[in-house]
Curated annotation (Swiss-Prot):
Pfam family name, one: Zn_ribbon_RPAB4
The record's free-text note on cofactor binding: Binds 1 zinc ion.
BP GO annotations: DNA-templated transcription
MF (Gene Ontology): DNA binding; DNA-directed RNA polymerase activity; zinc ion binding
SUPFAM superfamilies listed in its UniProt record: RNA polymerase subunits
Record localization: Cytoplasm
UniProt organism field: Haloarcula marismortui (strain ATCC 43049 / DSM 3752 / JCM 8966 / VKM B-1809)
UniProt-recorded name of the protein: DNA-directed RNA polymerase subunit Rpo12
Subunit structure: Part of the RNA polymerase complex.
EC numbers, comma separated: 2.7.7.6
Record lineage: Archaea, Methanobacteriati, Methanobacteriota, Stenosarchaea group, Halobacteria
Amino acid sequence: MSYKCSRCKRDVTLDEYGGVRCPYCGHRVLLKERSPDVKEINVN
């Protein structure tokens, strides 16, 4: 799963045992990337 660091804005892929921390700047706040898929919902 892909995350983005909130401080340096780089894409981060987390390891299973690596913990939640940006490997580039050490910041601990990561934002989950949204999928690029567009969902359509029919409203009747």
